[in-house]
């Protein structure tokens, strides 16, 4: 992701005043990215090797975009990143007018959607507006797939969005068309730091 954002013709290639901070727990992953995936040094890029939640808990700076892509296994989000308290910490990290993107592998509805539903409800408790995009091509709400949650610090301006979409690239427009338009009212409780059975929810998915 950092390489794509910063390298030509990436979206930030010509934005010299942009700054990108990556929080990665394992230094070996960064070394692998440099050795095998052509991640280059860039004065706009800062890499922090620490737990993402620990970083958030002490972070004072705010960001226009926060992207969360963390997994313990094929499906399980580390519990400390999917709770109501984590959502509040993420909200504090998002600047006014900014957005959080979070990658989750799950169904939307049914037993296989419990992980997504709990994280969705946690984000709804902290952000003004949350949308869901079925970016993995999920055909039906009960199918397991790649979901992208977009949580907005403020209610989106519909007129501004419509104007912005007129100049969006075809690839981005295709992504926006994957927005889930079904029911997003779930009884599943948000996870908390004291009760976060993410492994149990993930085991439901592993039986697929």
Language-model regions, residue ranges each:
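The AdoMet/dcAdoMet-binding core of the Class I SAM-like
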Residues: 1-101, 109-116, 124-126
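Soluble small-group transferase modules, centered on the S-adenosyl donor enzyme superfamily
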Residues: 131-208
């Amino acid at each position: 992701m950092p390489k794509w954002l910063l390298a030509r013709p990436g979206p930030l290639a010509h934005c010299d005043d942009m700054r990108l901070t990556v929080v990665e727990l394992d230094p070996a992953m960064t070394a692998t990215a440099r050795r095998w995936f052509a991640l280059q040094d860039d004065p706009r890029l800062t890499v922090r090797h620490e737990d993402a939640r620990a970083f958030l808990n002490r972070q004072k700076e705010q960001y226009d975009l926060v992207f969360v892509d963390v997994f313990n296994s094929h499906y399980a989000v580390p519990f400390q990143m999917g709770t109501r308290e984590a959502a509040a910490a993420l909200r504090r990290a998002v600047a006014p007018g900014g957005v959080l993107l979070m990658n989750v592998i799950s169904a939307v509805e049914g037993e296989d959607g419990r992980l997504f539903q709990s994280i969705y409800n946690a984000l709804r408790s902290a952000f003004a507006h949350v949308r869901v995009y079925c970016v993995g091509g999920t055909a039906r709400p009960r199918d397991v797939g790649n979901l992208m949650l977009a949580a907005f610090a403020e209610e989106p301006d519909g007129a501004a969005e419509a104007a912005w979409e007129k100049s969006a690239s075809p690839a981005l427009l295709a992504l926006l068309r994957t927005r889930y338009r079904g029911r997003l009212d779930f009884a599943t409780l948000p996870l908390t730091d004291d009760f976060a059975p993410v492994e149990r929810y993930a085991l439901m998915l592993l039986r697929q």
